[in-house]
Amino acid sequence: MTLDADKILILDFGSQYTQLIARRVREAGVYSEIYAGDIDHQSISDFNPSGIILSGGPESAFSDDSPKAATEIFTMGVPILGICYGMQTMAEQLGGHVRSSAHREFGYAEVSVQTSNRLFSGIEVSEDSLQVWMSHGDRVEALPEGFAIIGKSDSSPAAA
C-alpha cells in the first residue's frame, strides 16, 4: 500500500462497522482513511480520493437534522458507495425519497439480485440472491434520477 496508489475515503456516519469496512478495503491492498461524515468538502478534496464510501449510521436520512455528506462529493467524478444510511442519505441528498419502513430488517437477510453489476464482482451470488447483514428501519422509496435498483430485499425495494 502506498499513498500514491488508489485511496478510498470512508465517511463515517456512526456505523458500528466503519472500522471493519476500512479493514476490508485495506485487506484488498487499497489505502483508506476514515473521516467524520460531515467533514467539509475542502478536506475531502485535499485527500484526493479515488473513491468514497458512505458508512451506515443510526439516524434517519429524511430527518431535517440528520448528518449529511458535503454535496460537492457527488460532482467530484469519483465512484461513491453508500452502505445503509450512506445509501439512504445519498438518495435523499440527490432528490430521492427515504421513509420509515413498516418492517425493520436486522440480521441476515436475502437480497435478490435484479441485474448483473460490477459491484457484485468477486462475490458468490447463488441463484440470483446474496446473504447479507442488514440493520435498518428506513428504506429508499424513490430513487434519484439516473439511479437503478440492482438488488432488493423483502422490506427494501432498493437494497442495492
Give the location of each predicted region.
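Short, charged N-terminal beta->alpha structural module
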Residues: 7-28
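Hydrophobic anchor at the start of a short beta-strand
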Residues: 8, 32, 80
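Residues in the short beta-alpha loop(s) of Rossmann-like NAD(P)-binding domains
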Residues: 14, 38, 86
